[in-house]
Amino acid sequence: MATVIAADATSGEGFEDLAWLFSCDSRNRGLIRQGFDEAALLWKAVKATSGKVLEIGRNFGGSTVLLAAAAPDREIYSIDNRSHENSACKNYLTRSENRQRVQLLVTDSRKALPDLGFGFLFIDGDHSFEGVLADVVAHWNCLQADAGNLALAAFHDAVPNDNFKWRDTDRRFHRVLTRLKNKFRTRQKPEIAPDYSPGVWRVCEELVRRGAASKWQSAGSMLVLKKLTDLPRDFARLTAESTLTAKLDNK
């Protein structure tokens, strides 16, 4: 997918802007569970902001390491519903220079962290529509532009991409087998696994449509939005109703 670049995107180019020189797909995800181009965009977005950083969903902790490295003098708050960090990532995050500023929280991401504001928000937790919507409602209004910099929110698995194209192109037998099995299933499975989460995409689209955000940049499945305003009071209801209407229209 082509990268979306907003008018106020960072003009100076760094190594993170040269991800197009590399083969970037699901084969190079590693501990961070992101493509190289996605991780490069995450790094760039963090650098375009200031203030505290909030991460929803850290899994092995690879993305938390990237956030800590990209924002060496900033506080990082990472929320997950379990502690599942890779040992190498955990060792990095508990170094003396990181221990006091990186908070590895095990708590409910659908509840706001009291009395905290953030310059950057990264959401990669519950990918269901309901989960992403709840995370956005809980934390969006705590996202604030700081020191003249942008307030940005990054969403992983948010837009269609080619991350799994290499794998699915030659899986003809798998697709035929899935097609046959679907004849006997009450709930159909896709012949080609989705390369993004429709629930994440829907919430991001609603943020833009309701005027709360504009699209900043994207790479692979990663979408970065620029915050424009706080959420309308009834954003959750309006978004849920809009999604239900879209489903009914597609039947």
Name every feature range the model reports, one short phrase each.
Residues M1-A6:
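N-terminal auxiliary segments of SAM/dcSAM-dependent transferases
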Residues D8, G12-K251:
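S-adenosylmethionine/decaboxylated-SAM
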